[in-house]
């Protein structure tokens, strides 16, 4: 996919911001090196980034004697961008402060483009993506498929949750069952749930235990209700975190990590809930439809568009029932939308 072309003014602004950050980092680095060399900090230990506040990060200590405590940490300038979910090596200082000296390797990273079109990590070490749909508003293949392709592209297993199960009735029951059957036949896990009746919630909690998860889905499907049910003290925890960590800085809109009372962790932010197809190419899109994979590369023509070309392996698989028509149509619509986005960005 083509990259967004930046104007001279945008390039100048980016460079100016980077220069200012470098100057601040250099000043902070000098102070940190003084603390490190002066023996003012504790021995190195492992920690978990649970939030990001301006130039400081909230790090949860994972080793005694501070295990479970939250520290406000600065970062050494030679460390790449850190995000919520990163495991780090840090050293404790006075007054709940500290210094991050290294980042552990990431198992996974969720990225999205910034306002300049450059991909930036927003969360790390995610184990599963929970795609929330609902009986109302009616779910659509195209939207679910976009989330599934995005999950496949970053290599993070998805789990589909049909929320608002209490709204299933005679008018929509058969269609929803068919919808469910199609994705289960593709090998995707599925949970029926309702925050109103509490059905399916024990099953959901079991899937969340011992994992780090995120919720995605369109507005109105009940993501907030599910999160509030899983985190009944969320507002209190955010307030406590602000008191202990923010120290007058602005309220963050970046991702926060919460420990679920039932086990497991949840990383949440508005940006994460809008997770989607950001800057993927057509090859990645094709590979994101798992049932396409056995047929890719077997078309008669290398530049086959999978529409009406003779010898198209995907069209043949659709005719034989190996690929559902709804999924093929969804693929073509998504590809068209990506092409439109390419054209839009090239004209910026």
UniProtKB/Swiss-Prot annotation:
Pfam families: RsgA_GTPase (PF03193)
Phosphoprotein is among the record's keywords: no
Entry cofactors: Zn(2+)
Entry keyword set: Cytoplasm, GTP-binding, Hydrolase, Metal-binding, Nucleotide-binding, Ribosome biogenesis, RNA-binding, rRNA-binding, Zinc
Primary localization: cytoplasm
A GO cellular component annotation in the UniProt record: cytoplasm
PROSITE patterns per the UniProt record, alphabetical: ENGC_GTPASE, G_CP
Keyword RNA-binding on entry: yes
Enzyme's top EC category: hydrolase
Region (Disordered): 1-39
Binding residues for Zn(2+): 299, 304, 306, 312
Enzyme Commission identifier(s): 3.6.1.-
Binding-site residues, GTP: 163-166, 217-225
Localization: Cytoplasm
CDD domains assigned: YjeQ_EngC
UniProt biased composition (Basic residues): 1-14
MF GO annotations: GTP binding; GTPase activity; metal ion binding; rRNA binding
Biased composition (Basic and acidic residues): 16-31
Subunit structure of this chain's protein: Monomer. Associates with 30S ribosomal subunit, binds 16S rRNA.
Family as reported in the entry's similarity comment: Belongs to the TRAFAC class YlqF/YawG GTPase family. RsgA subfamily.
Function: One of several proteins that assist in the late maturation steps of the functional core of the 30S ribosomal subunit. Helps release RbfA from mature subunits. May play a role in the assembly of ribosomal proteins into the subunit. Circularly permuted GTPase that catalyzes slow GTP hydrolysis, GTPase activity is stimulated by the 30S ribosomal subunit.
Protein's UniProt name: Small ribosomal subunit biogenesis GTPase RsgA
Source species: Hahella chejuensis (strain KCTC 2396)
Gene name in the database record: rsgA
